Amino acid sequence: MKISFIEPAILLYAFAMTLTIPLTAQYVYRRIWEETGNYTFTSSSNVSECEQNKSSSTFAFQEEVQKKASLFSLQVEISGLIPGLVSTFMLLSSSDNHGRKLPMVLSSLGSLGTNLWLCAMSYFDLPLQLLVASTFIGALFGNYTTFWGACFAYIVDQEKEYKHRIIRIAVLDFMLGVVTGLTGLSSGYFIRELGFAWSYFIIAVVVLVNLAYILFFLSDPIKESSSQIVTMSCSESLKDLFYRTYMLFKNGSCKRRSLLCLLIFTLVVYFFVVFGITPVFTLYELGPPLCWNEVYIGYGSALGSLSFLSSFLGIWLFSYCLKDIHIAYVGIFTTMVGMMLTAFTRTTLMMFLVRISFFFTIMPLSILRSMLSKVVHSTEQGVLFACIAFLETLGGVTSTSAYNGIYSATVAWYPGFVFLLSAGLLVLPAVSLCMVKCIGWEEGSYTLLIHDEPSEHTSDS
């Protein structure tokens, strides 16, 4: 008998992703350090091998390593851009007819293959450039936005009432905060006690368990239409997919289309900033003046992951006195303050304290997705989240590529510049939300917007 709880799959995937990101960043950093300096990277119990005297040759060497690590991360992200965009859009769009499990299964297979390859690379000390090839192949199966988009659409399929949906998403954010916080906290100890190869192997085992749960225990609320599969060729299915995407923006009133476009713009720009700055945090903490080791990096990652937990509490508390749009404002402005403070942080204590200002960072993402789900019909949820995941994939790769490029160009004269730039970019989603408010967004007004039933969009020609 199959069950309809998507939460275990989300939590297992979150554990794997939260552990993979800091591990890979530090693995690349150490490999480039050793290849550039021709000697082994070491770390003490307090700080990494780091020189803070700017006149020292070691300081110049560290800056060179940071530049190379940033540029290599740029190559890796770009390699997965095109296949990730295509696979994400096609898998999530087709999930309205073929079920939500297919995108979850394929993206999990991609994650499994990538982590097994990283395990082999670190164990056999294979050339670092092979990571670019594995990223490209893994992206053909989808990526994290494919998985999250399918999971969110799965929840929307089950929870028809908006209030129940918000509660379930908020509880999920709470659980994600606990899992990612503990994972981030332990990431440094994984590296120190087990090394990179065994850490990646453990991640692969977790992904395999998650894959088994999705395949054999998770039910699918979307029933596959066998008649449509028989009568529609591959080209007709692709044509139908793009036509339904076109109808998503064509259907409805001008107000509905305006709200849809503005909310998507707000979500994508905010995601661009928040996701793009994440890998830079690790490089910023590894270099001077902080010079953190893998354990401190884990502490910082754990504090950052607490934003899931604190965002859940924030949504729960603020929902009693604030509207959705105002809750999103709170998250945007506190994140903006955190970016500005990070740019001027020079001590470990201050860096930990600055993380507090990021505690509501996840709130706008959860609120904006819920607001978007209000303005489309239930039969358009898959197409909507396919568009969102497509844009998030594009924005995620573009942002990490841009931030890595900017950081490598500015680290020598001012490492904190990217954080000031991020604070400035966050003005855009704030202004966009103002426009949403001016158009006339009201809590509950979505019931009028989705009464425009989507017209038939099967491709007959």
Curated annotation (Swiss-Prot):
GO molecular function: copper ion transmembrane transporter activity; symporter activity; transmembrane transporter activity
Main location: membrane
Membrane topology: Multi-pass membrane protein
TM ranges: 71-91, 104-124, 136-156, 171-191, 198-218, 261-281, 302-322, 325-345, 348-368, 382-402, 416-436
Protein task: Lysosomal proton-coupled steroid conjugate and bile acid transporter. Preferentially recognizes lipophilic steroid conjugates or bile acis as endogenous substrates and seems to mediate escape from lysosomes to the cytoplasm. Modulates hepatic cytosolic copper homeostasis, maybe acting as a lysosomal copper transporter and sequestering copper ions in the lysosome. Delivers pathogen-associated molecular patterns to cytosolic pattern recognition receptors as part of the innate immune response to microbes.
Keywords of the record: Glycoprotein, Lysosome, Membrane, Signal, Symport, Transmembrane, Transmembrane helix, Transport
Similarity comment: family membership: Belongs to the major facilitator superfamily. SLC46A family.
Cytoplasmic side, ranges: 92-103, 157-170, 219-260, 323-324, 369-381, 437-461
Protein name: Lysosomal proton-coupled steroid conjugate and bile acid symporter SLC46A3
Protein source organism: Rattus norvegicus
Entry GO terms, CC: lysosomal membrane
